[in-house]
């Protein structure tokens, strides 16, 4: 196990229901031809759903998510990775399953027990499909990298002897590099994962929901109630959403031409939050995505083909 030690400085509007959306927005006459990929998202008790673009064809992806910790889809669209709670009395196991997207056959599968015995670990598949990034809400678990057959690679326990907290984030960059948050710091960590470089100190009272585009060139992050983008080196920060409410959950399209935004982000249950799915061009302009007022030209509410209600999400979301 290794401890990273070098830092190189260089509002409640709509309550949650079983419906797949709210009727605030109307479907556009058609989505742009260059709006590509599939958005996978959790919604209430309906499991993991998907909507493919530009056709806006919707459907189920994972029907039963009662024991599902996380899901991911490879960037080439060939594989699905799931992490499920497979624990039994006294045996706190997470099962990782890599399966074929075309026929559902299992490619690799293994059980994992974290140092803290946490059965709610999550996994992300590396860009080259060779590694799994394992995160946990227990600081004793740190951040772990495994091969897709379960072989241990490395565990990062913290930075400068300060462990990672449950609020810190970790994600892949191209070349199997890591992008991490540690407190208010955003950090890049290249293989072999024993040192890192500071991207930016986020000196804001409220920020989160950091994400990176597939190309590893741009970041999106929520600051206070709105979404901002910036270059991977933290330059050219721009506010890209506005409204009288809150936006969150930004996700880049595979080609980085668009951003999915969780607009009207609100608490919908004692422990849960939900949001309306809208898409904006990733051109550095600021778009009004308000749930009540008229939206800026170019804002696209996501509505399944044949339906008339905007898609609502309530958990993890990816665009592949």
What are these regions (language model features)?
Residues 19-320:
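Sequence signature of WD/YWTD-type beta-propeller architectures
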Residues 12-15:
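C-terminal motif of bacterial Sec signal peptides marking the signal peptidase cleavage site
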Residues 2-9:
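Sec-dependent signal peptide recognition
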């Amino acid at each position: 196990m290794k401890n990273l030690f070098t830092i190189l400085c260089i509002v409640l509007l709509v309550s949650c229901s079983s419906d797949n959306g709210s009727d605030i927005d109307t479907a556009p006459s058609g989505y742009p031809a260059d709006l590509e990929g599939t958005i996978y998202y959790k919604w209430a008790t309906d499991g993991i759903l998907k909507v493919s673009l530009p056709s806006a064809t919707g459907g189920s992806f994972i029907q039963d998510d009662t024991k599902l910790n996380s899901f991911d889809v490879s960037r080439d669209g060939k594989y699905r990775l799931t992490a499920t709670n497979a624990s039994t009395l006294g045996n706190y196991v997470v099962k990782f399953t890599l399966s074929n997207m075309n026929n559902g056959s299992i490619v690799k599968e293994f059980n994992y027990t974290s140092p803290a015995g946490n059965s709610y670990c999550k996994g992300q598949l590396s860009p080259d499909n060779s590694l799994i990034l394992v995160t946990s809400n227990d600081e004793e678990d740190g951040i772990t990298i495994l091969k897709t057959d379960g072989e241990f690679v490395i565990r990062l326990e913290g930075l400068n002897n300060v462990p990672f907290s449950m609020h810190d984030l970790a994600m892949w960059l191209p070349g199997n590099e890591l992008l991490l948050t540690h407190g208010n710091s955003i950090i890049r960590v290249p293989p072999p994962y024993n040192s890192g470089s500071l991207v930016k100190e986020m000196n804001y009272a409220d920020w989160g929901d950091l994400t990176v585009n597939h190309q590893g060139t741009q970041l999106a992050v929520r600051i206070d109630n709105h979404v901002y983008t910036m270059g991977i080196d933290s330059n050219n920060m721009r506010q890209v959403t506005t409204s009288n409410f809150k936006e969150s959950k930004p996700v880049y399209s595979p080609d980085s031409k668009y951003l999915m935004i969780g607009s009207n982000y609100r608490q919908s249950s004692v422990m849960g939050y939900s949001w309306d799915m809208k898409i904006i061009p990733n051109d550095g302009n600021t778009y009004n995505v308000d749930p009540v007022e008229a939206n800026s030209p170019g804002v696209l509410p996501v509505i399944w083909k044949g339906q008339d209600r905007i898609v609502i999400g309530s958990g993890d979301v990816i665009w592949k």
